[in-house]
Each structure stands twice: as structure tokens, then as C-alpha cells.
Amino acid sequence: MLKQYIEKIISGQNLTQQEAGEAMDIILTGQANDSQLASFLSVLKMKGESLDEIAGFAKTLISHADHVPHSKPVMCNCGTGGDTKNTFNISTTAAFVLAAGGVTVAKHGNRGVSSASGSSDVLGELGVRYNLTPENAGKIIDDIGVAFLFAPAFNKAMKYVAKTRQELGYRTVFNLLGPIINPAGLDYQMVGIYDKNLTELIAGVLKEIGVKHALVIASEDGMDEISTNAPTKVSELKDGTIRTYEINPADYGFQPGSMADYAGGTPAENAAITLRILQGQEQGPKRDIVILNAGAALYAGNKAESIEAGIQLAQKMIDSGKALQKLQQLVAETQELGA
């Protein structure tokens, strides 16, 4: 059933947004066999995915997900993974700083992709239970302002692509789609991606699916985070327009180090790093990169007038213990509601 779409892509044409949605619907209802799916993903990658194609895929994926009911504007700060840098869980740690700063966070994540420890791995070590019903996840979002949405539990139709993605062994459009198909429906977002040539494209997709304010980031040293060691390219979506600029960490007083400064390890080791940062015991590069990323995300979440103001707020949220308190609240409530 994917044949007509594969043939159009082979001819060098982009699918319309409607056609992309139709193709994804075929995939997510199990109507495409493995060879068709592999062909579709491969020829799409060779052509290069267009904005309308990614937006059409994303809208259909979101429509197939288990929607999370909640009453607040929400944000997600996450990356595509796949940057191969094996860092500790920077965005997961930053999520608690965001929540303390007044951003409502629905963090959509999975097990490790670019590291040995994905967000669900480290949260499990910290005592967070993430097997939540959509209703319980929404309750946690409204109650404490931060919840973790385990992607496979909310996007069950993705089971139809898991085997083929694994067998292909290279990045496909699903790597880009992962961070933008949040089942809570996002108002704000900070997305880290592995390819700096795609920041404007993904910002355009976020505009198309209804995100109001977003930063799409890719650092010069290859991280899907804002780096404290190198400039980071940013495409910002705000008020319906997209502008691209560079964040230079030195402008905010951060001293460059080496990639080894951010090295992660096992889930237990990464959980210990997160705890030390939130407890105020960790000073230096690991704390710095969390503060820089949380500061930018506080700006994207409209809780700070600028990235600089966001950085100052992020520092206060850690030093006051409020960020740690958000983690403690999440552990307590998921222990009660989770499985």
C-alpha cells in the first residue's frame, strides 16, 4: 500500500502533507510489510525529508498516540539523541530546574539512544515510576508541574516500525520525529538535534504543528544540547516567525572545557550526577551545562525575558533547593500512581 508513495519519492518529488499523513497511517496500522517500510524510509532519507513530509508524519503520529489530558500550557526539553557523545542526562536534570522555575514540563523520552542511559533509565534509578496511564500522567503534570512520558507506552503504534528501524541501523525520519510527537500537546519546546543543517527545518515543523515558542539547537561540537565548550546554532520560533542565530557560551560567562567533562556512565552513575547537581554539591562543567540549557529553556517556556535572565533563574532554582524538591515530589507521586 506504500507503493504509490515510494514511487513518487523515487521520482524526486516531495509528498504533500496529506500524502505523508496517509503513508504514516498505513504504517501505524500495520498495513505495510517490512520490505515496504524499509524501502519507504530509505528512499525518503536519500531524497531528504521536506517540511510538509515531517509535519504530515508528526500530525498522524500524534493522532495515534494516547493523549495526555491536562489543564496547563506545557513544554518539553529533549533531543533526538544519536549524537554519540555519551553524556550524562543533561536535559533530564534540567527538566527539574524548569519545573521549579514555573515551566510545566511533560518530558517525552525513552531508554538510551546516544548514551548508555536514556531519560527513563536514569529516572528509574532515581525512584521515578514511569508506567503511567494517560490520566495519571496528566494529574501529575497538573499537580506538580513535571511528568515523564515513556514514549513506547504512549505511542504503541510505533511497534510496527521498531524491527525495521533496528535492522536498518541508520538514522531515519523517526529519529527527527521522536522529540516532536509529544502526546501531551506542546505549547513550548526546546529540541536538540544531531545535525545543525536541520534546525530551521525542524523549527518550521514545530510551527506547523502548533508550538508557540521553541528553540531548536545543535552545537558546533556535535551535541544535541547547548554546549558550554563551543558555539551552538539556534533556530528560534516565536510569534510565528523563525530566526537563526548563535549562542556563544563565553557571552554568558561559561568557561570552555572538554567533552570528557560531561561524560556519563551507567544509569546509576548518571542518577548520582543528577542528584549532586540538584543538591548543589556539584560545581563546575556539569552544573554549568545544566544551567545554560535550563536557562535557555526557561526563556523558550516564556518564564524568562532572555536567555541571560533564564540562566540567573536556573541558578536560583538549584541553589534554593526548589529543583531538588520537584524531583522529590515526582518520585513520591509516581510511587503512588505508577506501576
Name what the model sees in each region.
Residues 79-84, 109-115, 154, 220-221:
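Acidic, glycine-rich active-site loops and adjacent beta-strand->loop/helix elements
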Residues 1-87, 101, 105, 256-260, ...:
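Acidic, glycine/proline-rich low-complexity segments that act as flexible tails and inter-domain linkers
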Residues 14, 83-84, 114, 120, ...:
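Gly/Ser/Thr-rich beta-alpha loop segments that engage phosphate groups in nucleotides
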Residues 39, 93-97, 289, 293-296:
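Short amphipathic alpha-helical face segments that pack within enzyme cores
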Residues 41, 88-144:
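A glycine-rich phosphate/pyrophosphate-binding beta-strand-loop-alpha-helix module
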Residues 8, 63-66, 87, 102, ...:
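Glycine-rich anion-binding loops and their surrounding alpha/beta cores
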